[in-house]
């Protein structure tokens, strides 16, 4: 097993919750750089791709557009629409549904006054919709749909709607905030590892752990096809697995070899060119590389790797021990 794989098996996740809908996930230890890689990927997926429900249209009895003036109602229609956008809806299944309210004033109309279809739930019933100041009646119908992200009212398909329905900006994403921080952490005696702290807050329609789990599943679905590309890395890993050992022995070398140029190693042209293109000019540079770092050199194949290891061993350097001599 490669060193990075051993380290990956040691990763732990700690959940620090303020509530079911707000908290932190602390992930450590991560290989250097993986904190940003995972943090950025998870943040983008959480913000863009977690499905949710939202009101995308509404009909107010007697109102033909958002610019209509309503008698006996304190707020303008445009303000009512803004308030309706803040209503958080939870849906048990996907698809378009209906909700409605019918009240008689005077009254402060809230989301709690809405009668929802089976399978729909109002998460924030205290959200104010409008204030009716007279004894007039107010009837409103709502269209609820499911989706991802945010869809502005101009992009909502209204071709099958009655003329008096008004489109509403649909905030489908249940994620309110996502941020992440990277700090140094230890793994064994090494301190150059990442600790990822992922801060997540939802609108209350989904728990943070469910949102994160779904984001990971989405990422996995998009990465799975890459596993079919080939098994070259798997074969290479099998070839070198037995060569990697944890203990590092102290080796005795000739001090003069440390200042040698790689030209003096008498390598084949392919091996020499790979090292030169990687910016390796001297034996001292080569001696400082671990086996994993050698494997990352572009176009360096198994035969070239074996040749370099053998040449360095002749000089007293055993790079198979994953380090350079003291």
Curated annotation (Swiss-Prot):
Free-text note on domains in this protein's UniProt record: The N-terminal domain is essential for RNAP assembly and basal transcription, whereas the C-terminal domain is involved in interaction with transcriptional regulators and with upstream promoter elements.
Family stated for the protein in its record: Belongs to the RNA polymerase alpha chain family.
Natural source organism: Fusobacterium nucleatum subsp. nucleatum (strain ATCC 25586 / DSM 15643 / BCRC 10681 / CIP 101130 / JCM 8532 / KCTC 2640 / LMG 13131 / VPI 4355)
Source superkingdom: Bacteria
A cellular-component GO term for this protein: DNA-directed RNA polymerase complex
Lineage of source species: Bacteria, Fusobacteriati, Fusobacteriota, Fusobacteriia, Fusobacteriales
GO molecular function: DNA binding; DNA-directed RNA polymerase activity; protein dimerization activity
Name of this chain's protein: DNA-directed RNA polymerase subunit alpha
Region ranges (Alpha N-terminal domain (alpha-NTD)): 1-230
Function in brief: DNA-dependent RNA polymerase catalyzes the transcription of DNA into RNA using the four ribonucleoside triphosphates as substrates.
Gene it is expressed from: rpoA
GO terms (BP aspect): DNA-templated transcription
InterPro entries xref list: DNA-dir_RNA_pol_insert, DNA-dir_RNA_pol_RpoA/D/Rpb3, DNA-dir_RpoA, RBP11-like, RNAP_asu_C, RNApol_insert_sf
């Amino acid at each position: 097993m490669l060193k990075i794989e051993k380290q990956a098996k040691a990763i732990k996740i700690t959940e620090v919750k303020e509530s079911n809908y707000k908290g932190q996930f602390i992930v450590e230890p991560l290989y250097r750089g993986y904190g940003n890689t995972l943090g950025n990927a998870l943040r983008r997926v959480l913000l863009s791709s977690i499905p949710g429900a939202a009101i995308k249209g509404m009909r107010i009895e007697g109102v033909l557009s958002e610019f209509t003036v309503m008698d006996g109602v304190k707020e303008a229609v445009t303000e009512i629409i803004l308030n309706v956008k803040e209503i958080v809806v939870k849906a048990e299944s996907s698809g378009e549904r209906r909700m409605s309210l019918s009240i008689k004033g005077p009254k402060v109309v809230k989301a709690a006054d809405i009668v929802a279809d089976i399978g729909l739930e109002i998460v924030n019933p205290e959200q104010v919709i409008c204030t009716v100041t007279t004894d007039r009646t107010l009837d409103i119908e709502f269209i609820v749909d499911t989706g991802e992200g945010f869809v502005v009212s101009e992009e909502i398909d209204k071709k099958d709607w009655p003329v008096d329905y008004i489109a509403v900006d649909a905030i489908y994403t249940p994620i309110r905030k996502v941020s992440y921080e990277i700090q140094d952490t230890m793994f064994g005696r090494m301190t150059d590892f990442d600790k990822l702290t992922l801060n997540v807050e939802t609108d209350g329609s989904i728990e943070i752990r469910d949102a994160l789990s779904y984001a990971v599943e989405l990422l996995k679905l998009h990465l799975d096809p890459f596993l079919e590309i080939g098994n070259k890395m798997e074969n290479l890993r099998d070839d070198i697995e037995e060569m990697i050992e944890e203990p590092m022995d102290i080796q005795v070398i000739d001090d003069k070899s440390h200042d040698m140029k790689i030209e003096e190693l008498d390598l084949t042209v392919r091996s020499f060119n790979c090292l030169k293109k990687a910016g390796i000019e001297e034996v001292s540079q080569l001696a400082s590389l671990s086996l994993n770092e050698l494997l990352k050199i572009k176009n360096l194949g198994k035969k070239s790797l074996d040749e370099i290891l053998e040449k360095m061993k002749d000089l007293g350097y055993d790079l198979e021990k994953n380090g350079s001599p003291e």
